[in-house]
Curated annotation (Swiss-Prot):
It comes from Lactobacillus acidophilus (strain ATCC 700396 / NCK56 / N2 / NCFM). This is UPF0154 protein LBA1278. The lineage of its organism: Bacteria, Bacillati, Bacillota, Bacilli, Lactobacillales. HAMAP family: UPF0154. The chain crosses the membrane at residues 3-23. The keyword Acetylation does not apply.
């Protein structure tokens, strides 16, 4: 009986640890990408310039807002 209880507790501990690790890593990555977006305003300006568009502040902010809403 003690062996069965030990195996049961080990399995429960592994499941709880895996679940906590998953949600902890998920929260960390959300916070990281919010603080350090994968693309910056300077990169958007350079991209628009390469495509032949004149990068106004309004267009740059629209693109940044669209990207922020997609991350949520």
């Amino acid at each position: 009986m003690n062996l069965g209880l030990a195996i049961f507790l080990i399995i429960i501990a592994l499941l709880v640890g895996a679940t906590a690790g998953f949600y902890g890593a998920r929260a960390y990555m959300k916070k990281y990408f919010k603080e350090n977006p994968p693309i910056s305003e300077e990169m958007i300006v350079a991209m628009m310039s390469q495509m032949g568009q004149k990068p106004s502040n309004k267009k740059v902010h629209q693109v940044m807002n669209m990207m922020k809403h997609q991350q949520k």
